[in-house]
Each structure stands twice: as structure tokens, then as C-alpha cells.
Amino acid sequence: MKLSRRSFMKANAVAAAAAAAGLSVPGVARAVVGQQEAIKWDKAPCRFCGTGCGVLVGTQQGRVVACQGDPDAPVNRGLNCIKGYFLPKIMYGKDRLTQPLLRMKNGKYDKEGEFTPITWDQAFDVMEEKFKTALKEKGPESIGMFGSGQWTIWEGYAASKLFKAGFRSNNIDPNARHCMASAVVGFMRTFGMDEPMGCYDDIEQADAFVLWGANMAEMHPILWSRITNSRLSNQNVTVAVLSTYQHRSFELADNGIIFTPQSDLVILNYIANYIIQNNAINQDFFSKHVNLRKGATDIGYGLRPTHPLEKAAKNPGSDASEPMSFEDYKAFVAEYTLEKTAEMTGVPKDQLEQLAQLYADPNKKVISYWTMGFNQHTRGVWANNLVYNLHLLTGKISQPGCGPFSLTGQPSACGTAREVGTFAHRLPADMVVTNEKHRDICEKKWNIPSGTIPAKIGLHAVAQDRALKDGKLNVYWTMCTNNMQAGPNINEERMPGWRDPRNFIIVSDPYPTVSALAADLILPTAMWVEKEGAYGNAERRTQFWRQQVQAPGEAKSDLWQLVQFSRRFKTEEVWPEELLAKKPELRGKTLYEVLYATPEVSKFPVSELAEDQLNDESRELGFYLQKGLFEEYAWFGRGHGHDLAPFDDYHKARGLRWPVVNGKETQWRYSEGNDPYVKAGEGYKFYGKPDGKAVIFALPFEPAAEAPDEEYDLWLSTGRVLEHWHTGSMTRRVPELHRAFPEAVLFIHPLDAKARDLRRGDKVKVVSRRGEVISIVETRGRNRPPQGLVYMPFFDAAQLVNKLTLDATDPLSKETDFKKCAVKLEKV
């Protein structure tokens, strides 16, 4: 068989990757090389994390049969991580759901019944009855949706329109609340706009990398490979890694720092103090582009109001702040001396000084990276604000090789959850439901009556659990997420509400997850390239893909489910008379007609698709649904610093980083010469703020919501491992990944194990104040906790570690702290 150079590279990429991963090379190589001409290739972003790697997807006879890194993708440059190479297999698990399943007994729905196959019409019949009953009896606040940072952009947009405009309920929130909400609030407080100002191109231009609570070696391995290349090829590049336990990223670290949980706040303030004391402030930048404010303190822990910690808080949930002088700020951080910081954190003084010197050195270009260690934190917003302080004091921001960078964990936590605005308080392009002007903009664009979108913030993720338990939220639809496994405090706050006979729970998913099996109705869902989609990654890169195969059986995309279900409701059934009177022409119309089959959305014909191009939703409806929704959504950000390119441009490109102005993407925001919104002569402009200045916040250390004591004497931290993604609902169906890490283990220091008469491989009961799980003792391996802390991944459905965790949240972002609670161990 004769191959072009390009085809030869494609074919061999899989073989090379398989060899690097230690897989059986001949079979993989033959599958690609031997059948090259028979396989159809097309591009897509990876289905997993927020890095946004580009892959080439090979299809044959209606199935995805191969996958390789896309050599033209600027993010990963042809390389995949181990999960990326097995993308085809996530779609073909033996237990893939192919038809709706309803709990039934004696031929009808029963909360205690067995899951029984039904048709889509029957599923929508039951859903329609439950939604209409709840809306009639209790109103819009009795229904809710929990969505996903894995939704495509138009799925999230369609869901937000259906709930906020159609059902008039802001009780829609994404699972990104559990991972990125603190980053969002941190960005908004400091800069007035969400998402990083830099991009991945910084990696090759930086002199120093500082990881705050980020194990990039396992969670963002492709970016880590680029950092590793930079570090090993340049002796002047430095890597510092901070964590509460030792992990694989420490292998590259020049300065590996293990600190006491929660004390990262102390370290951040110490570095600010060091910068000031050593006259390392960039005075020109600081004087022109920065304001100083002192934030409210003693703000509580996002627990129920009846909890003692909430009762004791002086300013529960307060986001207030007041202006302060530089002298006052200097005095504030002066308290965080080297001696005090070393004592509070357990970090040796020399390591602290080395870290501070990186930021203080005017000749060092520094990037700060962080993920869940910062965000899943009862003071996660503060941690985000405090790291911005370091970059604003030194002016190391919005320039190549310099800047703070919040990494995302889901493929479209940025593009869908944040940019589209699927949070309970947000609207597209950083607008919010509490702002009348913002609501008015959306209502006019959507051609719905003024006053349709509620001004009240809806229920966030943890509040949804509590409302279900309390019987206030009665119909609940979750999509593309597995919150029964991933959310905190399963026993006390989630399971009771899901199984409450007053409530009806719908789960849309490709597989029978823990969440699906706890639901009342399961809807089978199309996944990844079984639909046309778009994701937005951590560097503001929006990427599109085409539908490449059809979903099995009766599985349907989340977009199809939302749009088709909207046909079941007429405006009179969901809107009060005073709204209908404002737009009488909408009487008698379905929500489908009002929200989706509008002149604005339906104006792009199906004929724009290639004749052989799959697009199940658009061909069924008779118009190019995805293009119509995207162009309507993109209107909100254009001209406002969130500019997205025209729809068709994304199918041609390997992603574009917004703002995209006059066909050109933006690598670095807020700086002259890089950002089209910064005029000549302005230098820097943080245009999310009215005065164009960013904010440095004075924020102190405050303790964790729960710490070890005499009985529960260990910290528990939870997280992920390289081989599995989140709850493992996809990766555990890949035999190779499952074999590589078949079950969760409890990583523990050997001396802590010895003190409890535990040995490696022993079964151990892990107990918190909320529940218990049985796990396996691991005293070796990739994760090495210090004495006093244990670490456990949450991918294993047989070991629900979130039975143990506390539902404490950051009071500002409402994001859960999965990194800190107290446990004890009992030998089994």
C-alpha cells in the first residue's frame, strides 16, 4: 500500500504512542497502517480534561476505530496522554445505555420499581407530567437542572435558555461548580472578567513555573510534557511544586514544598510581604494599573445556616471590600514573616525564601499554575486573589512567559459552564441574572417578554442537594455528570433527596453510573463524536468537531433531549399572564418555537452541511441547529471583549483563542500590542473594571472547616489519578486503563500505617463523621502523603469516598472543599 508522507505520519503516530505507553504495538499499528485507506479521519478535541488536545478520529463502518494525536493541533502537537489514546473505547462499553429506562411496578412509574425499558415518547410523557405538576403547585423554584463542563457549547446554551427563559428558573448549575467556581469569582473580583489572560505559548517562554495545588504530571500530562521539555532543555528554568502531599510532579521540581492543609494562604501572603520588603514591586506598573482593597473576613464555610460554624461567623458569605492605602496593605502582609510562615505551614525557611525569590526577581518570567488544590478550598476565591496579588505587585502578567493561569479539569468548563453562563447566577459573556441591564439584553435578544428571566440567583450545586432533601426542589434533571459519586457528603445531603418519594430524578448519561442507578428515569445519551460539538479549553481556545458516527440504539444527544422536550410546553403553561400580555404574539406557541425554532436560530439551512455529513439533530429539525444556536450566543460577546469568530471558521481551524477580532485570535489579554481592546499608549488595561485597573486584595489566613482532632486524627484529601478521569464512568470501561489502576487505594505514610498496625495491601475502614468506606492500604507508589494525611482518589464506584467528605464550600464561590476533612482508620 502506497502512503503519502502525511498518511505515513498519521499511521505511525499511533504505533509510536502505543510503544511509549507500553501497549501491544503490532495490533495497533496494523489497525492503522493496514487499513489506512478504509478509515476516514477527522479532527476533534479530546473528550477528557480542559487542556484541549487535538486528536484525529478514525471511523470505519459506523464506528470509531482509531485515535491519534493531531500533529497540526497547537496544544499537543501530535501527542496524546494515555487516556487520549484510548478514546475510541470509551464509547463501546458493554453496558452502554441504548433506550430510556423508568422505574416501574405493575406497568406504571413507581419510585421503588425496577428499571424498565420505555420509548422516548413515554419518557417525555412522564417528565412532562412531573414538570407541569411541580410548576403548577410550587412554581419555577421547585424544578432544577445539574449540568456539566462536558456539555458542548450549544448544549449548555440550549439548557440555559430552557430553564432561565422557558421555565423561568435559575436553578440550573454545572458540575463546574465543584471545580472552577472559585477561579471564576477570583477572576471577577480581581479583573472584572473571567478566564486567564495568558495561553499555553507561555510555557516555552517562561523562566519559572510554580504549581499551587496542581499535579500536572497526572492531571494535565500534555502540558506537563511541554514544561518538562522546557525544564530539561534549559538549565536556567526552575520548577516549584506546592502540595499537601508528594506526587509525580515533584519528580521534576527544583523546589518541592509540602505544606500543612489550608496554610497556602499564609505562604501567599508571605511572598507578598517578601516582595515589598525587598523593594521588588514594579512601581511603574503598580502605580498605573492597580487598586488596593481590604476584603471582609470571618465569612463562614457555606454550610447550612444552622451549623455551628455558620452561626459563629461574623460576616457569613460576605463579598464586601473597602479601599485601602498601600501603607495599610504593607502593614497587613508584614504580619506574615518568614518565621511565622515556616511555623504555620511546616515548610523549611530556605524553601520559602527560594520560592519568594522567584516572584521577586525582576529578571524571572514566572507562571503560576493551579487547579483543584486552590479551587476546592473553603477560601478558594481568596487563594485565587492572593496569587494574582503576586503577579500584580511585580507586573508579571499579560506578557509572554508571565502570568497567573487557572487550569481547568473539564473539556468545556470554560467554553460552556463559564462563557455560556450555565451557572445559577450567570448569563452569557460574564453577565449575571441579578443585573437588570444584563437580563434586559438577553430578553431582547431572545425576543421574550421583559421580566421573564428571574432576578433571584438560583440554587447552586450543594444548595440543590439540600433543597432536594428538604422537599423544596421536586423535579431534578442531571446531564453529563455523575454527582451521586462526585459530590460531597453523599449520605447526609444527597442520597436522601434523590430517594425522597416527593422528588422525581432524571439522569441523562451514556452509562449506568452511580447517579443513574439512584435516579427514577435514565435517558440514554449520545457522546463525543456521536454528535456535532464545540468545547472551550483553559486557554480560551474554542474548538469544533463534526458528528462522525451515530449513537447506538435510541441514544440521543443532550441537545436533542432539551430541544425535543421543549415541545411539550406552551407559553401559557410556564409564563404568567402579565408576561404574555407584553408579547401576545407568543401565546399558544411552544417553548420549542419560542426558544429554538426562531427566525434567529433557524435561518441557517441544512444544505450548509455536506451531503454526506452526519448531523442527526439538524436533519431531523430541518435547519442547522448548532450553527443557529452558536451564532445567537456569540452575539452576546462580540464587541465586549469576548469576541468569538464566525461559526464556519472553527470547522476550518484547530481552535481559536478569544477575543477573535478581525480574524485574529488573542494570545495575551490586557496588554498593548497583544489585545485589540487595549489602545496604543495604554500599556495595560484591565477593561473588565470600570477604571481599567486590577485589584490587589488584603485577605488573611482562616482555618479549614474541619481539621483532625483526637478521635478523627488524619486529614483526608481526595483527587484523581492519571489513568482515570473523574468518576471513571468512561475510563473504567477501557480494559487497559482499568487494568492499570483497577481500584482505589488509600495512600498513607508508612509510619502512620505502622502506628495503626496496618500493612500495604491490608483492607482498612476509613471513617469520618458522615460515613465510612473500605479501601486498601498503599504505603508506596506515586503519591506519598506526609504523616497526618491520607489521600484517596474518587474514580472507584465501589469505594465512594464522598461518603466521607464534608459539604463545606467557599462562601463566595459555593465550591466544595474536597481536599480537607478529618478521618480515622480502623483495620478490617
Curated annotation (Swiss-Prot):
It is found in: Periplasm. It is an enzyme of class 1 (oxidoreductase). PANTHER family: PERIPLASMIC NITRATE REDUCTASE, RESPIRATORY NITRATE REDUCTASE. Mo-bis(molybdopterin guanine dinucleotide) binds at residues 83, 150, 175, 179, 212-219, 243-247, 262-264, 372, 376, 482, 508-509, 531, 558, 718-727, 802, 819. GO terms for cellular component: membrane; nitrate reductase complex; periplasmic space. Its cofactor is [4Fe-4S] cluster; Mo-bis(molybdopterin guanine dinucleotide). This is Periplasmic nitrate reductase. Predicted to be exported by the Tat system. The position of the signal peptide cleavage has not been experimentally proven. Disulfide bonds: none annotated. GO terms for molecular function: 4 iron, 4 sulfur cluster binding; electron transfer activity; iron ion binding; molybdenum ion binding; molybdopterin cofactor binding; nitrate reductase (cytochrome) activity. The gene is napA. Its main location: periplasm. It comes from Shigella flexneri. HAMAP family: Nitrate_reduct_NapA.
